[in-house]
Amino acid sequence: MIQVQRILGLPVLHENGKFAGKVKDLWFDEFWTPVGVILDRYTRSGLIRKMPRAVYWEDIVHCGEDALLIRNSTVIATIDSKQLLRTFHTGVVRLKDMSVYTIEGRHLGEVSDVYFHPSEGTQILGYELTDGFLADVFEGRRKLFLPESPENIVLGEDAILVPASYERILTRDHTRKVTGEDG
């Protein structure tokens, strides 16, 4: 299982060891399935590229703790920014900080991280929710892992709606150290 916050900022390397860039964001399709990773826009000389670059998830050979490995430079695609509608934290529709509500209107928190399997075409497995910095420090963040076949979940542009019964499956992580943006 992978957490999005853990792969942001990781180096992307070719199988021969050549540096390709760093992970800037995760890109999702309209069903919130991971499509690929967006690379930073900086060149080795510090210049900024005009068009974003991305690597499709199926072209990532391995997603490790400290780096992502890709086959070669041909798998790096230059894409139009308009294609990057749904991302974790930089797109038009951002999953990070999106509010999660039950269908009965109870606020469960905001998304601070997302869990998914590293295999291609995997749906989101769960969310880490925050109630604010102080609640995170004193009580821990809450995790909402989705059932095997999540039904009745609405992944909207402004909020995520879940059945009221999902409130019972929230767990608090009291051991999670909250130190900054990456939690």
Where are these regions (language model features)?
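Peripheral interaction segments used for macromolecular assembly
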Residues: 1-183
